[in-house]
A protein has these predicted regions:
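Extracytoplasmic small-molecule ligand-binding "clamshell" domains
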Residues: 1-64, 119-126, 130-131, 187
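Extended ligand-binding regions for polar small-molecule ligands
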Residues: 13-25, 83-108, 112-113, 145-149, ...
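N-terminal/domain-start segments enriched in small and hydrophobic, helix-friendly residues
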Residues: 30-32, 56, 68-82, 88-101
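A ligand-binding cleft/hinge motif common to bilobed small-molecule-binding domains
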Residues: 39, 43, 54-65, 110-113, ...
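Conserved functional loop/turn residues at catalytic and ligand-binding sites
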Residues: 49, 98, 137
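Short beta-strand->loop
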Residues: 66-74, 78, 121, 157-168, ...
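Carboxylate-rich, polar loop motifs that coordinate divalent cations or form catalytic acidic clusters
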Residues: 86, 125-129, 141-150, 178, ...
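Alpha-helical transmembrane signal-anchor helices
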Residues: 212-239
Length: 239
């Protein structure tokens, strides 16, 4: 979550809202096929047992297996820390500390390859990564804004925060079986018909993000006082 999950054999999450809109746009009924995990969904689509895979990251070695839509979900990767830690405006400031990543994710591998000299520690899930941050085992965790925001909102509110971002994006596509290029083209048109407000509504329904920035309240108060002093000085000089 928040992208998608199965609860009582029901598909929920941001992607389910996308699928409902696509169903409405195309005026067709889409039948949900429950699977035990994403890998099973991937295999069923490759074997043409399912028509649509709702979410997949593009990789060149998958081109001969699936047709990809254009990316329809695009989130920055962010840095989560304990609430007492300062704003992080440059990831290079984390070179000498431990950073948690989710084990086995293609996006985690991408980050490790780009930042080769960093001290990454892998955990089975994002929840485990953030628990490690909370317990001081690592300084920070990195993942997409959506999943970190959802996890903090539901399990670490008041303990962890989003303290910065890195120059990587999570781009997700839908996919169809390699033999069904026409369907991928139809999905692209349906996705293009979803406007920005609808996309924001889908996201905000599941995730609330409080993004830490480097202008904290104390600094804003100091700036306000300084501006007031300057105004008073000019008023005295030019009265």
């Amino acid at each position: 979550m928040p992208f998608e999950s199965i609860v009582n054999r029901k598909h929920i999450g941001i992607l389910e809202d996308y699928m409902k809109q696509i169903s409405k746009s195309l005026n067709i009924d889409l039948k949900f096929v429950p699977t035990s995990n994403w890998h099973e969904s991937f295999e069923k689509t490759v074997k043409n047992e399912c028509d649509i895979l709702t979410t997949i990251a593009y990789k060149t070695n998958r081109e001969n297996l699936l047709n990809f839509t254009k990316p329809y979900v695009d989130f920055p990767f962010v840095i989560a820390t304990d609430i007492t830690k300062p704003f992080i405006d440059d990831i290079n400031k984390l070179k000498d500390v431990k950073i948690a990543l989710v084990r086995g994710f293609a996006t985690s591998k991408l980050i490790q390859e780009k930042y080769k000299n960093f001290k990454f520690v892998e955990y089975p899930s994002l929840h485990d990564c953030l628990t490690a941050v909370k317990n001081g085992e690592v300084y920070a965790a990195i993942d997409s804004l959506a999943v970190i925001g959802f996890e903090i909102q539901n399990n670490f509110l008041g303990e962890l925060k989003v303290s910065g971002r890195i120059d990587e994006q999570l781009k997700l596509h839908m996919a169809t079986n390699i033999e069904n290029k026409h369907l991928a083209s139809i999905l692209d048109k349906a996705l293009d018909s979803i406007n920005d407000k609808q996309k924001h509504d889908f996201f905000n329904k599941w995730v609330y993000i409080k993004y830490e920035n480097n202008l904290d309240n104390e600094l804003l108060v100091r700036i306000s006082i300084l501006l007031l002093i300057i105004f008073i000085v000019f008023a005295i000089i030019y009265r």
